[in-house]
């Protein structure tokens, strides 16, 4: 699933639209479509992580927050998609916390040291890392074929 229902920012494709790729009569089940949707959103994020990695160097882990992070299925899929350790926090309102941190930093000039409790961490297996590299290559191929990226 390519989740560009209202365009996309990374890569910059404001007119792109979502699509399900590789559907057949044999695999077109509600469960497969739901999983493809979750994977598509995570692969879109993984593309952004790859861009960041190219610009800044090594990325050591991914932090999941919010409601979807509470799903064990999402955690497992994210571990496989990113091929990196996944850290799950109990901060459901991460945007509000991030905004408050930025405001405190702007007002004091010092980045606040506010600990965020970690619920769990999930380590990728070697198979996860290999699969992530292969699927990212396929994801980039879909982007190139359909969107010229």
Go through the PLM ranges and name each one.
Residues 1-149:
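Glycine/Thr-rich phosphate-binding loops that ligate phosphate moieties of nucleotide
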């Amino acid at each position: 699933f390519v989740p560009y229902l209202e365009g996309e920012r990374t890569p910059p494709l404001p007119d792109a639209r979502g699509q399900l790729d590789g559907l057949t009569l044999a695999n077109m089940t509600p469960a497969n479509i739901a999983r493809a949707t979750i994977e598509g959103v995570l692969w879109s994020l993984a593309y952004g992580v790859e861009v960041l990695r190219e610009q800044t160097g090594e990325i050591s882990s991914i932090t999941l927050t919010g409601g979807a992070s509470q799903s064990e299925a999402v955690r497992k899929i994210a571990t496989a998609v990113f091929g990196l350790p996944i850290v799950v926090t109990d901060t459901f309102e991460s945007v509000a916390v991030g905004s408050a941190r930025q405001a405190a930093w702007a007002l004091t000039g010092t980045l606040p040291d506010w600990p965020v409790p970690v619920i769990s961490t999930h380590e990728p297996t070697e198979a996860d890392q290999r699969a992530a590299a292969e699927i990212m290559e396929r994801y980039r191929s879909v982007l190139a074929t359909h969107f010229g990226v």
